[in-house]
Amino acid sequence: MHLIIFLFYFIIMSSRFSFAETIQIDFTADDSYSVEVAKINVGDTIEWSPKNEGHNVEFLGGPDFSSLPEKSDLNAFYSVTFNLPGVYLYHCTPHGNMGMLGLVIVGNDFHNLKDIEGIELSRVAKSVLQRLIRIAQSNS
């Protein structure tokens, strides 16, 4: 009987901490993402919704450049589950040079931040990236 109680308690307590979360990000009318810096845990999912037309998600960098998520279609719902800790940079393909960028920080891990900062961007996008990095680091 004690074993059953222990197992029940263990399952309840461990499942309480193992649920992955889903974050919702919308494409906005002002050519930005509704959440510009998303801080998530390993195993969490981000869903991008086309609340405004003419936008998509294209990853420019992450902890492993060889296995970045594929670019989404324009005006399409898009979902990515993040299983590798680190910093991910993405933009809207048509509006990236105008600063439509987003950062995902997985597991509060900034080990690849220098690689992200080294990605070639327009002057406007580089300025936006620096602002997003300051936001991410101030909340860590």
Predicted regions and their residues:
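Positively charged n-region of N-terminal signal peptides that target proteins for export
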Residues: 1-6
